[in-house]
Regions:
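Conserved Rossmann-fold NAD(P)-dependent oxidoreductase catalytic core, especially the SDR/UDP-sugar
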Residues: 245, 364, 368-371, 376-428, ...
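NAD(P)-cofactor binding segment of oxidoreductase domains
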Residues: 220-234, 306-313, 356, 376-403
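Strand-loop microenvironment adjacent to phosphate/nucleotide-handling motifs in alpha/beta enzyme folds
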Residues: 267, 272-276, 432-633
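Signature of alpha-helical transmembrane segments in polytopic membrane proteins
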Residues: 1-141, 180-183, 205, 209, ...
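N-terminal Rossmann NAD(P)H-binding glycine-rich loop of SDR-like oxidoreductase domains
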Residues: 282-298
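Conserved Rossmann-fold cofactor-binding substructure of NAD(P)-dependent oxidoreductases
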Residues: 341-361
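Flexible, Lys/Arg-rich cytosolic regulatory linkers and terminal tails that connect or flank
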Residues: 192, 219-281, 397
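A solvent-exposed beta-alpha-beta segment
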Residues: 36-38, 130-244, 312-319, 326-329, ...
Length: 633
């Protein structure tokens, strides 16, 4: 009968085995004690001895049941169980004295001491041996892990691990030399350089990061070092969850790209965050999108009087409205959240909303941002990105709005695709309106690159492909991109908007560009898998190069020209841009509008080339309807 079969036995049967075992231990203890005074074997067989033993055994088992010694038969033995066994053995020794005196009427002082020592050793050692066997059995079934970080959070994680049978922690690892070579909660603390030895000795397959207070740079450095060990790396939540006591095994998550690419945030300046928001009516277009929804979260924290959520998608509007109301309930916020459906191309709808609610500030995040989708649907992209922005801006002027901030993109810089060119045209519209005489609305625009976790980002695509076993598809092995976290981008947009004087083009410092193929490799390795390539044909995940998509750039730029000026904020700059006065731009816009109505793709392209957008298309016309109509018959 193997251990699995024994563990599967009914609970009452396992209790019976322990009762029988303890009766045997009582007999052994009784025999050892009596052997000190019994000289001949026939005395052992006396009725008095058997009556004394039987009485002691029955009373002791009843006592053990009463003190709960059999409640945790198959569990690991705790100090409480061992204490109960010792206490029960002491009482049993007293019972031994009483029964011996009753049935034999003579008792040596050494007898109960010997009885107690033999019984307590027999009862507790069997349970400790069981604990060792079960621990070893469960450990073989569990995944051996290393906890990186022996501080308070690492210790909390260890306690959480002990509550489940999924992981077996074999060691702590910590960068602090002061606690290396110490033992914490029965686990030794090792130097990070000893990780290869631990992996080899114990077959470690996962490393759990418990360093929530580390800086982004420190996390990146640790994660890059761990990449060499081919183990899956998981991490606990941030400090907020730690403070709230929410650390548990289920809260462990895979290393996110934010951990790989994140940087130390610059604390937002309160006066800039609140300047256009606090005690004002704020409207966000595209409120249900990646950037729009984060803007709403940040704005809510700055306590406007009203927050207007303007969104075309009913479901997206429902989702962000529900989330914000739940946040308000938790925080006790009194901000009035107003969910409004509508299109940014409907100027009358926009104007009526802005006037009805006396809007002070508009953050215009509504746009079509996916390069291939706009390339395949050129007219809709231009109508939404160019004329949608123009409608919003003109409605803002009509309603006497104070501040209008356009969320732009790095793809507007020397664009090679229609999406980028349309966003540059949107910028030109705001620049022209800002330059109008006696303009009361302060227009500005903020450019930045890719945000981590946004819809259409490579990151969730790669995560899905890795989860499905690959391959990861990449358009070009040399493609690079700038990345920023969504919260940081939203905070910088708000602060840049407060710094604008009118017609400003702000550029956010995106840090260093990232080679996407390196990012893909990191994500594979940190998932505990291996890259499959010519050098490693037996790897797990292959990276396939599919070729650049229509309008896609290898490299992205954030600035036009060399006249870049710093601002008072270390991560916000301004760029000097070519612009057209409204009298000239309006003619181009009129022709562009006519071309859209007539579905004239050739004229659309020529107009985008004629305007000072820097548009250099790398592909022919990719609009799907146009291509269908122009197929050779």
């Amino acid at each position: 009968m193997n251990l699995e079969t024994l563990l599967a036995l009914p609970r009452n049967l396992k209790k019976t085995f322990f009762v029988i075992h303890d009766i045997l231990m009582i007999f052994v203890a009784f025999w050892f004690a009596q052997s000190l005074k019994v000289q001949y074997s026939d005395e052992w067989l006396s009725i008095a001895n058997w009556l004394a033993f039987g009485s002691t055994a029955v009373l002791t088992i009843i006592l053990f049941i009463r003190i709960g010694l059999y409640r945790a038969v198959t569990r690991f033995v705790s100090i409480r169980v061992l204490t109960s066994a010792a206490f029960g053995s002491i009482i049993s020794a007293v019972l031994f004295c009483l029964t011996t005196l009753i049935f034999e009427q003579k008792l040596h002082l050494a007898l109960p001491i010997v009885y107690f020592l033999v019984l307590v050793v027999g009862v507790t050692s069997s349970r400790m041996i069981l604990r060792a066997i079960l621990t070893d059995h469960h450990r073989k079934q569990m995944t051996p892990v290393i906890i990186y970080g022996a501080g308070q959070s690492g210790r909390q994680l260890l306690e959480a691990i002990k509550q489940v049978n999924e992981y077996s922690a074999i060691a702590f690892v910590d960068d602090n030399p002061k606690i290396q070579r110490t033992v914490i909660y029965d686990l030794a603390v090792y130097n990070p350089n000893e990780i290869p030895m631990l992996i080899s000795r114990y077959g470690v397959r996962k490393i759990l990061l418990a360093i929530p207070s580390s800086t982004p740079e420190e996390r990146k450095d640790i994660i890059r070092r761990l990449e060499a060990y081919k183990c899956e790396v998981l991490t606990i939540p941030g400090m907020k969850d730690l403070v709230d006591g929410k650390i548990n095994v289920s809260s462990l998550k895979k290393i996110s790209v934010v951990d790989l690419l994140g940087r130390a945030p610059v604390a937002p300046r309160p006066e800039l965050m609140s300047a256009d928001i606090s005690d004002k009516v704020v409207m966000v277009t595209g409120a249900g999108g990646s950037i729009g929804s984060e803007l709403c979260r940040q704005i809510l924290n700055c306590r406007p009087t009203k927050l207007l959520l303007f969104e075309l998608s009913e479901f997206a509007l429902y989702s962000i409205d529900k989330e914000l109301r739940e946040t308000q309930a938790a925080q006790g916020s009194q901000v009035e959240v107003v969910p409004l459906l509508g299109s940014v191309q409907n100027k009358e709808r926009l104007s009526s909303i802005m006037k009805a609610y006396h809007v002070d500030t508009v953050y215009h995040a509504a746009a079509y941002k996916h390069v291939p989708m706009v390339e395949f649907n050129t007219i809709e992209g231009i109508q939404n990105n160019v004329f949608g922005t123009l409608c919003c801006a003109q409605a803002a002027v009509d309603a006497g709005i104070s501040t209008f901030v356009l969320i732009s993109t790095d793809k507007a810089v020397r664009p090679t695709n229609t999406m980028g060119a349309s966003k540059r045209m949107a910028e030109l519209c705001l620049q022209a309106l800002a330059a109008e005489p006696e303009q009361k609305t302060r227009f500005c625009m903020v450019r930045f690159g890719n945000v981590l976790g946004s819809s259409g980002s490579v990151v969730p695509v790669f995560e899905k492909q890795i989860a499905e076993g690959g391959p990861i598809t990449l358009t070009h092995q040399d493609i690079t991109r700038y990345f920023m976290t969504i919260p940081e981008a939203a905070q910088l947009v708000i602060q840049a908007g407060a710094m604008g004087k009118g017609g400003d083009v702000f550029v956010l410092d995106m840090g260093e560009s990232v080679k996407i193929i390196d990012l893909a490799r990191q994500m594979i390795v940190l998932s505990g898998l291996k890259v499959k390539d010519e050098q490693h044909p037996h790897g797990d995940i292959e990276i396939k190069i599919t070729g650049l998509r229509p309008g896609e750039k290898l490299y992205e730029e954030l600035l036009i020209g060399d006249e870049v000026q710093k601002t008072t904020h270390p991560r916000i700059m301004t760029a000097s841009e070519v612009m057209l006065p409204w009298t000239q731009l309006s003619d181009i816009l009129s022709e562009l509008h006519t071309a859209c109505l007539q579905s004239d793709q050739n004229s659309l392209r020529q107009l985008l080339l004629r305007a000072p957008t820097g548009f250099v298309p790398k592909d022919g016309i990719c609009d799907l309807v146009w291509q269908q109509n122009n197929k050779a018959v």
